A protein has these predicted regions:
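C-terminal helix-to-coil terminal segments
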Residues: 121-208
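Glycine-rich NAD(P)-binding loop of Rossmann-like domains
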Residues: 1-15, 180
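Residues at the starts of beta-strands that form the adenosine-phosphate
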Residues: 3, 25-26
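Rossmann-like adenosine-cofactor binding region
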Residues: 34-130
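Conserved acidic E/D residue at the C-terminus of a beta-strand in Rossmann-like folds
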Residues: 29-31
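Short, structured coil segments at secondary-structure junctions
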Residues: 23, 43-44, 133-135
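Gly/Ala-rich phosphate-binding loop of Rossmann-like dinucleotide-binding domains
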Residues: 17, 21, 107-108
Length: 208
């Protein structure tokens, strides 16, 4: 079977691995925090402390990490060159995790066989975005979170956060990103300090 790896194995990444288990695949993951041994055994997962060690053996790499300074342009020319030749990237996280021009060059050279994703940078994508004319790509306009079940989950989460705020009680860690000016809860688990907001200025360079 194919070797499939996820960059990050939080709620979304782990759910992706669970969905792929029935398809006779070899599943891999890279994350700053290792999953519990019972989960690894349940899904027969191979953990990689180093991202590049996973990339060189995977036929498909799915990106499920947030955008922060450590992941901005994580997949650039150098990183993609370390991937298994002819591999595929699936990016449903954030567009700027992948260097758009590096991806296009890798498709053209054959280093990547294809690229699929639900996210662009900038977004919405301008008419001259290189991915619009790139061969072997499957792109959608950031619609993966618009299912009825996802919308219901968002609404329930917002309500719970507001109720905690007005009641003066602690917000659950899974909803917490920053507290007292510091990363906290899920934010401390998944993000790094710094700013990726320069992307907003970069986006103004594109034609509409």
């Amino acid at each position: 079977g194919m070797h499939i790896g996820t960059v990050a194995a939080g709620r979304i990444g782990l759910d992706a691995l669970r969905k792929m288990k029935p398809f006779d695949t070899h599943l891999h993951y890279f994350d700053r925090h290792r999953l519990h041994e019972s989960v690894e055994k349940e899904l027969n997962l191979t953990y990689h402390e180093d991202l590049d060690s996973m990339l060189k053996i995977c036929d498909v790499v799915t990106i499920n990490c947030p955008l922060h300074p450590e992941t901005e342009h994580l997949f650039n020319d150098e990183r993609i060159s370390k991937m298994k030749k002819g591999a595929y990237i699936v990016n449903t996280a954030r567009g700027k995790i992948c260097d758009k021009d590096a991806v296009a060059r890798a498709i053209q050279s054959g280093q990547l066989s294809g690229y699929a994703g639900d996210v662009w940078f900038p977004q919405p994508a301008p008419n001259d975005h290189v991915w619009r004319d790139m061969p072997n790509n499957g792109m959608t306009p950031h619609t993966s979170g618009t299912s009825l079940s996802a919308q219901a989950r968002y609404a329930a989460g917002v309500r719970e956060i507001l109720e905690c705020f007005f009641d003066g009680t602690n917000i659950r860690d899974q909803y917490l990103i920053v507290k007292d000016g510091n990363l906290a809860g899920m934010g401390a688990h998944s993000y790094s300090k710094g700013s990726s907001t320069e992307g907003s200025e970069e986006a103004t360079k594109y034609k509409k």
